Amino acid sequence: TNPESGEVERKQAARQLARLAAADIPGAHPEQWWSARSVAAETPLHTSGSLSPSRVEALLNCPLKAVLGNVAEDPSTEEHLLRGTLAHAFFEAIGRGMDAEKAKLLVMEAFERIQDVPQWQLRFKLDEFSTLLDRAREWARQSEVNQELAGVEIPVGVRVSEEVRIGGYMDRLLRDGEGNYLVVDLKTGRSKPAKKEGEDHVQLMTYQLALAHGAFDGHQVHDGEGMPRQGGVLVYPGATTKKIGEIWQSDKSPEALEEFAALLPPLVEEMRGPRITARTNKDCDKCPIRSICPVQE
């Protein structure tokens, strides 16, 4: 609560308090703080109404975790994010024409520098990451046999309603011979969901909604009359499967996208506050703020 505290100090304090509260240490839980038992303000925050696909997914799962979850993340989460960032950098570099071997060498060197593990574990991590990059490269090569690469890391800024604007970056955008666009989203996790989950995948649906209200000028997707679509695909080169993992989503109808779009304005309201919803979902057991969540016993 010290206004002079920095962002790092506040996050560390929140992380430690969450751990103390989980251990039932008296006074650690915010409910036991007399100064924190009432609402500090009733005035909503001013927001732009911009939502990224990942933000939409997080807010639909649990608004409370979407807003506060990052203050209690552990160091392993940071390493996972850095691993994903480097893999995406490689995917982008080869898409822009950089020599794949040179790009891999640079990314592997960066990945090794962020490791703080024993030598035996380092070798395993390097081999695993190298395989992920090789499989991502192979998927990219195969995907361009019958389709044209329209762009990589494409900025998206499309207003889909008066209240909501979708913003973010598409990893890749492919175009078939008839001019239909396919959204490609690279996932760097070690496991992939069941194929049936693709049809309802929120991030792909959000990208499709943006394309349905957008136009592509060769560099970015902006407000427009709508683009012809093939749907979307999640690519999992790091999954422990023989074949490179793919989860597909078909081209959604205007009715399906309209129904999905109706879910978004309430998410903007959640971000504005001053009150926010806590919602049970399948990830509650591993939520970093479970110990202070009002819907958990």
Which residues does each predicted region cover?
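Metal-dependent nuclease catalytic regions and adjoining charged, substrate-binding loops involved
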Residues: P3-R15, L20, D24-I25, L211-E297
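C-terminal, charged and often intrinsically disordered regions of DNA end-processing helicases
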Residues: T1-G97, E148-A150, T280, I289
